[in-house]
């Protein structure tokens, strides 16, 4: 299967803030018309984030053939969920997900409670023929006893209600191969995020091999402290085995999209996207 490529709009967040119309048109000009939103103001807003209004979104989707193939929601709560899903369905989006979660070290009961919550969200989405997905960072690969949090989430969540969007970069940063995860849980993944890791990064690829203790209590302040812009690279410019990742993802039965997500760009955001897109064109099993 040739994998369709899209983009998580967080990759161009600063460009969107300055010129949303110009940015979305620039992405469409590159052929990037499959977009994933990131609504970080879900307490008060229903859309795809970045200040993009519903009217403008409808207009540019119609004029440029853009489709919204997913949207991360933060904060994620049951009270606002029906209203948010109403909006997403109106724009033709059938997937919503969480963007970031933290788990107090060793607290298995907390993991279970969050898994139960994800099942509830997934059930509400499924009642509308929509999907709920879980997006990871590195902290899900911390071991709580003999299993990682990610393994526990796979175990505690209902496969029919909770899908997964694997951020392959962050899996490596947690010391786990995304290829192994694809092979271990082939039915669970519907999308993935792709970026790269520079060869000259100041710290090891696996954060647990250097700056992070195995028993660290990871929260947002620590995450932000560990997030180093110099440790991100455009697709095809670093050391990650991206063709192998693509090949593994292409074999998954429920997998739909590989999304470029550049947490930090080496230069201007749209130039960064162009660099990654040109790299994607050189890989096999890719559909632009």
Show the residue positions of the predicted features.
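Histidine-acidic metal/acid-base catalytic patches
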Residues: 1-33, 62, 89-92, 147-166, ...
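Glycine-rich, proline-tolerant flexible connector loops at the mouths of alpha/beta enzymes
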Residues: 35-59
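Conserved glycine-rich "GG(E/T)P / GGGxP" loop and the immediately following alpha-helix
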Residues: 17-18, 45-51, 143-144
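Charged, low-complexity surface patches
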Residues: 16, 50, 76-77, 114, ...
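Active-site-proximal loop/turn and secondary-structure-junction residues that shape catalytic pockets
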Residues: 11-13, 39-41, 74-77, 102-104, ...
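A generic secondary-structure micro-motif detector
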Residues: 12-13, 46-47, 74, 110-111, ...
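Active-site acidic/histidine proton-transfer and metal-coordination neighborhood
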Residues: 25, 34, 63, 67-164, ...
């Amino acid at each position: 299967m040739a994998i369709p490529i899209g983009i998580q709009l967080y990759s161009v967040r600063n460009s969107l803030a300055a010129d949303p119309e110009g940015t979305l048109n620039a992405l469409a000009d590159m052929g990037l018309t499959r977009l994933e939103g990131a609504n970080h103001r879900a307490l008060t807003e229903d859309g795809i984030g970045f200040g993009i209004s519903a009217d403008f979104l409808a207009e540019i989707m119609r004029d440029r053939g853009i489709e919204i193939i997913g949207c991360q929601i933060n904060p994620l709560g049951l009270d606002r969920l029906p209203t948010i899903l109403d909006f997403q369905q109106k724009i033709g989006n059938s997937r919503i997900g969480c963007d970031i979660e933290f788990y107090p070290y060793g607290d298995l009961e907390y993991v279970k409670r969050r898994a139960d919550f994800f099942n509830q969200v997934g059930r509400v989405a499924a009642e509308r023929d929509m999907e709920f997905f879980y997006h990871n960072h590195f902290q899900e690969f911390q071991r709580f006893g003999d299993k990682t949090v990610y393994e526990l989430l796979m175990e505690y969540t209902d496969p029919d209600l909770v899908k997964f969007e694997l951020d392959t970069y962050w899996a490596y940063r947690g010391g786990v191969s995304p290829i192994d995860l694809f092979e271990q849980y082939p039915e669970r993944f519907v999308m993935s995020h792709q970026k790269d890791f520079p060869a000259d990064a100041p710290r090891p690829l696996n954060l647990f091999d250097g700056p992070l203790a195995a028993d660290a209590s990871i929260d947002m302040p620590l995450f932000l402290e560990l997030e180093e812009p110099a440790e991100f690279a455009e697709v095809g410019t670093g050391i990650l085995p991206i063709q192998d990742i693509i090949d593994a993802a292409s074999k998954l039965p429920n997998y739909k999209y590989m999304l470029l997500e550049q947490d930090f760009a080496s230069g201007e955001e749209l130039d960064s996207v162009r660099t990654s897109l040109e790299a994607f064109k050189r890989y096999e099993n890719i559909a632009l």
